[in-house]
Amino acid sequence: MTRRFVTWGIPALLALSGGALVAQQSDEALFMTGAEPVSPEDYAKLPKQGRFRAYLPKQVDLSNAYPPPGSQGPQPNCVAWATTYAARTFLNFRDKNVQPDEPSEQMSPAYVYNRLRPAGTPCTGTISIVQALTLLKNEGTVSLAEFPDDMTKCAVPAAEGLKEKAGNFRLLDWRAVDREVKDDWRTPIILDDVKGALARGAPVIFAMPAPADFKAFRGDGVYRRAEKPDKANYHAMAIVGYDEDRQALRIMNSWGPIWGDKGYAWVDYATFKLLTGEAYSLEAPIASVAPGAPPPPPRSDAQVFADQVAAMPCGAVSVQGKSVTGFSGDLNAIAALREAATKADPAMTVAVRHMPWPQCEAALTLAAPLARAGTSLVTLTADGKDRGGDPVMMQENDIFGVSATTSAARPYLSIIYLQADGSAVELHRGHPEPDRKGVRRVTIGLSQTAQRYQVAPPFGPEMIIALSSAKPLFGDDEVVNGTERQFLTRLRAKLVSQQDDALSAAYVRLQTTR
């Protein structure tokens, strides 16, 4: 497919020909915004996306199914570019292996912007994301080839028949992302819910103020800001991925490739939470297969097996000769891998353990610390003997204890319990002193007068994690307790901030029953 030629208009051409200094001097005039923010009261009433409580990969990048970053030019129609050109086009191509780079493949932001502008109004009016999403759900849109973007005109009526064609590209649904304290506009958008939507392949649109330093941003670095700007217009953009190692979201703008990193940018998680006023996830109807479309090319049994290994959800699989080992959080994926291995080579042996989420994500996140010596963890019977097994089997009313050891190199110890009710509870945080033999050990849960642990409902798979660090992993006032999703996200952020060898870990898996 050929690349779409983007018309930039006079200001952008001058910036391109005049070099970086001219671009920097004219950023304010060159980069238009145009998002009409929704009021906190109205945002609270919008339908909300459900809380995400599942596996999050370390990285997600959906940009290959998005069109190339375009330019909204001098019109304040960023909302249409984000919702329609970016997100609605993506929904047409997320299951394909080509990038939509032709006008006939790209959804028209001009159609949406013009449909929402009253006839005869000037090209200075803004629209809200909710208005655009409502139009896309009720009416749809058409391609850029059918309704080209003319930056000199607005409130242009659609040609006869286009509205009927637009119905082919409706949204199935959209949902607002809730805030950390439900419907409290003073608290941030829930970042894990944004990442969760991206992880399941849903596009996310958001709006934030676009201050001067954001307009001047260039390169592959991470945009950061410590405080809200005093005054800046709201700007809508698409989120195309995230990277836990960078602790940043990947966004696609509508200011052309001369901005940011060829039209994209990384935005720091904390900055996103500080600035973002609203965010939405989108979904489209399942596209029907075009009549006469050729079937996908056949794959060999070896290719199918290799693909199953590479795509193992919430897991890690290793193939050594004819031995396949590892773990995954998905029983169906393990069964499919076993079947594919048998077809590829009947002599293969598959020993892939099932570790349901959140256990599988904890094991993936802590892969490097788990490989380092210095931390041990066991569960104990009521009389202090080691409980064996993987997982350790325990029944209702069983008394149990937890014993962990650490080392002089990493003397700070935290013990976290991921429980069957979906919560993460910090059982211990401290700095154990060495005993007479030099062993730094903590034993908890078996006291007759203080903490005493007893198995109680709800029952199911659980996990206890010991984390040993050279310096305190969590701050004195930092609360670790929360959901397992919140803990795993916090843990990833902590690992990014630690030196490579500063952390060691161990875990014990539990299975509690009635």
Regions found by a protein language model. Name each.
Residues 74-75, 79-87, 108, 112, ...:
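Stable alpha-helical elements in mature extracytoplasmic
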Residues 9-17:
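Bacterial N-terminal signal peptides
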Residues 24-76, 80-98, 124-144:
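Structured alpha-helical subdomains that flank or immediately precede key functional sites
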Residues 56, 84, 88, 116-252, ...:
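Predominantly the structural core of cysteine protease catalytic domains
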Residues 1-10:
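Bacterial N-terminal signal peptides that target proteins for export
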Residues 64-77, 115-125, 180-184, 193, ...:
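Second-shell loop/turn segments in exported
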Residues 293-514:
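Secretory-pathway glycoprotein ectodomains that are cysteine- and/or Ser/Thr/Pro-rich
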Residues 86-119:
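Active-site-surrounding "flap" and adjacent substrate/cofactor-binding loops of secreted or lumenal enzymes
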